[in-house]
């Protein structure tokens, strides 16, 4: 693989090399690093650590994809300014990518005099179709809700794993309260037939090794963390990630699609 960048650069202000945030596991409580994301539109999200260095004007974000001769040609796709109130200067969502194409990213810190830092590490990801969420939405009276969706996918990019994430809107930090990761056992239902998966209480705390699940857990569950009781009355939101490609060495997802958040209330 050949990586092609631009010409040598000036760094008279000694700008700091940006550090990419390492990618989290799909079932971790906090979603970090490069990933699929849906905010008004689906895209690939990259994250880097914030820095209070003096003299920085903006971050330049570069993107590349493989060409027919296996070279990766990078071009600058955007600038993220320190004073841009519409953007978080440590997160960028790229909504201009094509589905099923592997994209590579790195960033540089640019000083007010035009000097540039060295390039950050390069990260990569593939965006797939977003699942279509059906329920639960609005108000329900079930403390063990059934999650239903359509698995939108394409040939050669079938979903192999799913991750459901629930957050309690009445908590200030909006951390996940329940996460379940499970194998796809519904091959052949893609794009048309609804898939259902019922909530069950977790048996493990966050980050614990967990190989024993609740008696109500389906047989295809890989992991489940968080809430160890039924959903109480309150306001929640949930989303679904469909994963098609996982790195066999580190277990990290490398290709996925993610639904937008859907909101529901539990009232008995």
Residue ranges and their predicted role:
Residues 92-116, 228-250:
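Beta-strand-rich modules
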Residues 7-55, 99, 114-156, 251-268:
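Pro/Thr/Ser/Gly-rich low-complexity, intrinsically disordered linker/stalk tracts
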Residues 50, 58-98, 161-231:
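Recognizes extended acidic, P/S/T-rich segments that occur
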Residues 53, 66, 112, 154, ...:
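Short coil/turn motifs at secondary-structure junctions
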Residues 6-9, 41, 70, 159, ...:
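Intrinsically disordered, phosphorylation-rich cytoplasmic tails of plasma-membrane receptors
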Residues 22-27, 37, 42, 48, ...:
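Membrane-topology and secretion signals of cell-surface/extracellular proteins
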């Amino acid at each position: 693989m050949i990586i092609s960048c631009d010409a040598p650069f000036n760094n008279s202000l000694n700008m700091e090399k940006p550090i990419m945030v390492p990618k989290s596991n799909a079932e971790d409580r906090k979603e970090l690093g490069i990933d699929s994301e849906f905010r008004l539109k689906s895209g690939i999200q990259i994250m880097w650590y914030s820095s209070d260095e003096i003299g920085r004007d903006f971050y330049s974000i570069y993107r590349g994809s493989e060409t027919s001769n296996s070279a990766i040609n990078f071009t600058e796709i955007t600038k993220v300014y320190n004073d841009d109130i519409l953007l978080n200067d440590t997160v960028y969502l790229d909504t201009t990518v094509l589905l099923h194409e592997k994209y590579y990213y790195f960033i540089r810190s640019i000083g007010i005099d035009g000097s540039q830092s060295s390039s950050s590490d390069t990260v990569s990801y593939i965006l797939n179709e977003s699942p279509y969420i059906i329920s639960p939405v609005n108000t329900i009276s079930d403390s063990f809700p059934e999650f239903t969706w359509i698995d939108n996918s394409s040939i050669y990019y079938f979903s192999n794993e799913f991750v459901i994430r629930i957050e309690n809107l009445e908590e200030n930090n909006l951390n996940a309260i329940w996460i379940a990761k499970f194998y796809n056992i519904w091959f052949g239902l893609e794009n048309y037939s609804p898939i259902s998966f019922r909530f069950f209480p977790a048996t493990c705390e966050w980050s614990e090794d967990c190989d024993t699940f609740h008696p109500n857990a389906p047989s295809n569950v890989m992991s489940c963390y968080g809430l160890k009781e039924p959903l109480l009355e309150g306001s929640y939101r949930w989303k679904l990630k469909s994963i098609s490609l996982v790195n066999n060495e580190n277990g990290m997802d490398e290709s996925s699609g993610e639904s937008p958040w859907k909101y529901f209330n539990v009232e008995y």
